[in-house]
Regions:
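Signature of N-terminal electron-transfer/Fe-S-associated modules in redox systems
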Residues: 1-155, 593
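Short beta-strand elements
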Residues: 46, 173, 179, 183, ...
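Glycine-rich loop/linker segments at domain edges
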Residues: 90, 164, 170-176, 305-347, ...
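Flexible, low-hydrophobicity surface segments
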Residues: 145-309, 327, 412
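C-terminal catalytic domains of large/alpha subunits in multi-subunit enzymes
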Residues: 225-226, 377-382, 412-417, 446, ...
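Phosphate/diphosphate-binding loops
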Residues: 257, 263-265, 414-462, 669-688
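Helix-loop-helix junctions that connect adjacent transmembrane helices in secondary transporters/permeases
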Residues: 294-376, 540-609, 618, 691-714, ...
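Thiamine diphosphate
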Residues: 393-414, 418-419, 623, 627
Length: 855
């Protein structure tokens, strides 16, 4: 037992436990987030006697007489200042790391009221952010310091039209910690659930012994596949993922669930899981695509080890390459990458009449609903899903991980339940970025004009399909780069293995093939005798040009403008003798390739305010703010009269998955269409007069399938374009500056766009230089959150985001999604900078022999 002070009140911790658990589970101080419980991420940072401390480290018995402060204990003035400053700076995206950042900022400003930028960055070095790239968080800390010194707050922006730099709609609840992520929910009678996982990557389950676990006091149920009332199979596109492995069936990877346990307390849950015994017949595993392709390879799935093959061809690349004056062929390798979102997967499910209500953190409420419907054998009206705040996704929360398990327990026990992954489970279970082995050949004429490209790509898609097929397809369609030439051919294969699954990850396969084509183009520039900038300018796709996939691009195409935007920075680096690398990229907005892709919005007038309902997840990218700005701009309704509602499946229409950089364009266009009807009604009525009325908008983006035999095929509604460059310090070899110019069509909220660019650049700096996700001979990841190699605030260089607004797109207000492309050209730009630094051509990520490389 220990007695100490929390937020000015004396408290008693009767049992010895982690401070994090005491603050959250007993005091309900949920601003203190559980991001890893390993002392690595900093989301649980509190002040102990004025010193920032990770609450997941100290035991309560060691805190006798201590004084502890959480965000809930800040003064009203402090909360106002941090909310305004972080909003003004654009420091908040998913928000999961922000309360911990605020506490670290307070520790700094209490002792240093006028810190330098370097001091602010150092103060949050133990707080990881995966969204923002830290730039705007540091800006927010410096703004807060200024407000505290001056004793006043400036006015927040009042112009909420499209194009304005506004505070995000959810900034206050994220800064003060009052917003709810699923793990922040505590309900009367709530159970705690978790899965017992496979001990072998590939083994037949012979028996599951649950008797001892069921007999343990506090255990409510132990469920196996035999208890599932509907289908045991789930899967985002292909139903090949087992909810639980049944007796007699074979495991596919170490993350497979064998059974589910639900108990009254977390302690009873942990004890019960340890009592479950499973008999296995161990079987040979498939470790990589090279093994998967062998004629006598074990089958990961009955239908074979090949998930997908993609072949794309236009023109005759073999002939074009043969006639090229210059030809380069290289092999490339890119690694597994962990999303490392700060919020581990969590869901709370409750019985709801004859069905269930699931409170979730994912990238598509309707996708989750459909998975649960199939598993429980229930119609849509009996399965309700509502998004809470989502603590980052980046593609890693498109597949169900805990939602269906929580739903099953709640449905069968008629009790509410929380199912949450530990950080170790999260690192193992959710799909990662595909590792790829690639070979690219590039041919150019004497002027550096691309004649043709031929390529092959092999991807490890892991244990389950997830989105492996579409990821491979996108890698192939975009492997040609954003250039105009007619001869392109690529073959891609994705193979099942017994490794963790691979699926969607920011960039969706394009990060891998972009690394190849851009690296070759930089090398080719030397052969031709021109600069990397010039070779791109000569080949860049322009309005009216034809991409290698056959699509004629429209007037919104802005690649040239991004090249011109970085030119002064490129020339300055060359003039100063600084090693500089350059790369371009393009990325589609929307699903495209003939697949139905729809955005939907419902506007409802309630109690004199307009409520926005869209079944699209906001995962930190700022969709809610985009829709509010759209409504204010289109209708003239004042910001205080507009309410953004979180996604759900009973009131918000299905707006598709938050993926493919699609929501700003597709759901944004749907919102514009709904606003047009509302605006007509407002010509004759006040908003109050329209009480109870609804206004619906829908936009269907029509595209052509790959290989469609039609004139001028349209693979995607829109593309974003980018040019990034990396400047190294010529003495130290460390990155001095990253410049990122992005064509976004129309920047709805430039503050958010800058934050997306900065965050994407830092994420791919890690991809290029430091991040690792090693897997051992037992198909087990050998990594913890703290050893992933994530960049920290005091390690980032100057980042210069440049917003290029090229008009011409006639949907979505001209806005093109930017969530993915920000991470795509970074790695090849960095690789080229190091080639200029030391002459070494690097074709494998993460890059070797740099000052950032692990010793």
């Amino acid at each position: 037992m220990a007695v100490f002070t929390v937020n000015g009140k004396t408290v008693t911790a009767e049992k010895n436990q982690k401070l994090l658990r005491f603050l959250r589970d007993e005091l309900r101080l949920t601003s203190v987030k559980d991001g890893c419980s390993e002392g690595a991420c900093g989301t649980c940072t509190v002040l102990i006697d004025g010193k920032p401390t990770k609450a997941c480290v100290p035991q309560t018995d060691k805190l006798e007489g201590k004084t502890i402060l959480t965000v809930e204990g800040l003064s009203d003035w402090e909360r106002e200042v941090y909310t305004w400053a972080f909003g003004e700076a654009g420091a908040v995206q998913c928000g999961f790391c922000i309360p911990g950042m605020v506490i670290s900022a307070k520790a700094l400003l209490d002792t240093n009221p006028d810190p330098s930028r370097e001091e602010a960055a150092f103060a949050i070095r133990n707080n990881i952010c995966r969204c923002t790239g830290y730039v705007k968080i540091i800006d927010g800390i410096l703004l807060a310091a200024k407000c505290f010194r001056e004793g006043k707050l400036p006015e927040a922006p009042v112009d909420w039209k499209v194009g304005s730099r506004v505070h995000r709609v959810d900034v206050a609840e994220k800064v003060t910690g009052t917003g709810q992520y699923p793990d922040d929910i505590y309900l009367d009678g709530m159970l705690y659930g978790s899965a017992v996982r496979s001990q072998h990557p590939r083994a037949r389950v012979l028996a599951i012994h649950t008797e001892e676990a069921k007999a343990l006091p506090g255990v409510v149920c132990v469920l196996t596949a035999a208890d599932i009332p509907g289908s045991n199979k789930v899967g985002h596109l292909k139903k090949d993922w087992d909810t639980m492995i049944a007796v007699g069936d074979i495991t596919h990877y170490l993350g497979d669930a064998i059974c589910l346990v639900a108990a009254e307390t977390p302690e009873a849950l942990a004890q019960a899981k340890a009592l479950v015994k499973v008999d296995y017949e161990e079987l040979p595993a498939v470790h990589n695509p090279q093994e998967a392709i062998l004629p006598d390879a074990p089958l990961v799935h009955r239908e074979g080890n090949l998930l997908a093959h993609k072949h794309i061809q236009r023109g005759n690349p073999a002939e074009a390459l043969a006639k090229s004056k210059y030809l380069i062929t290289r092999r490339f390798s890119t690694p597994w990458t962990e999303h490392a979102f700060l919020e581990p997967e969590c869901a709370v499910a409750c019985p709801d009449g004859d069905g269930v209500l699931v409170l979730s953190t994912d990238q598509g409420a309707y996708d989750t609903q459909h998975e649960i419907m199939g598993m429980l054998g229930l119609p849509a009206e009996q399965v309700k899903v509502r998004n809470c705040l989502v603590g980052g996704g980046f593609g890693g929360k498109e597949d169900v991980t805990v939602q269906h398990h929580a739903a099953l327990i709640a449905y069968l026990t008629k009790r509410p339940v929380k199912v949450k992954l530990t950080r170790a489970e999260s690192l193992l279970i959710h799909p990662k970025r595909h590792p790829m082995e690639m070979e690219f050949s590039l041919g150019c004429d004497e002027n550096g004009i691309i004649q043709g490209v031929a390529a092959e790509c092999i991807a490890d898609t892991g244990a389950y399909a997830s989105l492996g097929g579409p990821v491979l397809e996108r890698a192939c369609t975009h492997g040609a780069g954003p250039y105009q030439y007619e001869a392109y051919e690529i073959d891609g294969w994705a193979y099942y293995t017994n490794n963790p699954p691979a699926g969607a990850f920011r960039g969706f396969g394009v990060t891998q093939t972009c690394f190849c084509i851009e690296t070759l183009l930089n090398e080719m520039a030397d052969k031709v005798g021109i600069s990397p900038w010039e070779i791109r300018y000569r080949n860049a796709i322009r309005p009216g040009g034809v991409l290698p996939n056959g699509q004629i691009v429209d007037d919104s195409t802005g690649l040239i403008e991004t090249l011109e935007a970085v030119k002064p920075y490129y020339d300055e680096a060359v003039k100063n003798g600084d090693p500089v690398g350059l790369a371009c990229a393009m990325k589609n907005a929307g699903v495209g390739v003939g697949i139905p892709d729809t955005g939907r919005v419902r506007l409802v007038v309630r109690e004199g305010k307009l409520h926005i309902f869209a079944g699209a997840s906001c995962i930190g990218q700022g969709l809610g703010t985009v829709l509010v700005q759209t409504v204010c701009g289109e209708t003239g309704i004042a910001r205080p009269d507009v309410v953004y509602e979180r996604s759900n499946t009973w009131m918000a229409p299905d707006s598709g998955t938050t993926s493919g950089s699609r929501q700003t364009l597709f759901t944004g266009e749907a919102c514009i269409r709904a606003c047009q009807d509302l605006k007509k009604a407002l010509e004759e009525h006040s908003l109050a007069d329209l009480e109870g009325q609804e206004f619906y908008g829908e936009y269907l983006g029509k595209t052509d399938p790959l290989g469609a035999d039609v004139p001028n095929p349209v693979s995607h509604i829109a593309y974003g374009y980018a040019t990034q460059l990396c400047v190294l310090d010529k003495d130290t070899g460390r990155i001095k500056q990253m410049v990122a110019a992005h064509d976004v069509g129309k920047a709805v909220n430039p503050l958010s766009v800058e934050g997306q660019i900065e965050g994407g650049v830092v994420m791919s700096m890690g991809y290029a230089l430091t991040e690792r996700y090693p897997i051992d001979e037992n198909c087990r990841p050998t990594v913890k959150f703290g050893t992933l190699g994530l960049f920290r605030a005091n390690q980032i260089p100057e980042i210069k985001p440049i917003i290029v607004e090229k008009p011409g797109l006639n949907v979505g207000g001209g806005a093109i999604g930017i969530g993915e492309i920000t991470s795509i050209p970074t790695a090849p730009a960095i690789a080229e900078a190091y080639r200029r630094y030391d002459g070494e051509l690097r074709t494998e990520l993460p890059l070797k022999n740099t000052p950032y490389a692990k010793k």
